[in-house]
Amino acid sequence: MKIWTVLLISLTPSYLLAQNNLGPRLTALGSNGAAVTDIWSLQANPAGIILVTKATVSLNYTKHLFSDEISTQALVAVLPFKNNYVGASFQRYGFAEYSESKVGFAYSKTFGKKLSFGLNGNYHQLKITNYGSSTGFSVDVGALYKLNKNFTFGGFISNPTKQKFNSSEISAQISTSFNVGVSYYPSDKVLIATAVSKVLNQSVNVSLGLDYRIVDLLSLRGGLSTSPFKQYAGFGLDFRNFILDMATTYDANLGYAPQIALGYAF
């Protein structure tokens, strides 16, 4: 075990404990998932999966460059039927001596052409060498409202009941957050998204992102967030049924965290 890595995690948990992996597209938009529709909304606002028109799966890998050992792997899948949508997600973060895993199952439903609601149930597992493991459960609830072709408003709450890991050996809180946002489409090619998020016991975070579709095949993205200050950039390729997204996050304290996701719509 590398002692410095364990000490780093214990001393700076707000930076190193796993956050929901939003996939490269939402990450490149400033980790902006409150009012943006995407398959990776399963990891943010579950109501945001409503524009997935075909059974779709996406696999993601993130490398945290401040340590050669730490990485994140994630998988999401969505199956639409009529005005109902079901989804499943998996995420693992960590290294050999420390890991966090989460499995989620979501259900979303549209009501007319403007309103949708989503619910996501999560099973969490935390493992620390020499300390054992612990499990916990949480839920995410969210909603989207499409005002018109230009504006969409959204919001979601993660773990509103403040659930914790249930082991006496490991005392850890599953984070609770409140998130609201708006997406603005000035044209068919441009998306501007912003969100305000509050994780309990942390500062309010404001994020802003831009998605510009240059051609049908290629989109360029960028974003910012304030707490802590981070910069984001990425691109997406959409070719036939394949979807390739890449993004990187820059944090002044932790450096770069590039990620890639490959998806397929059946």
Please give the residue ranges for each predicted region.
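Sec-dependent N-terminal signal peptides
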Residues: 3-13
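Subset of outer-membrane beta-barrel
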Residues: 17-266
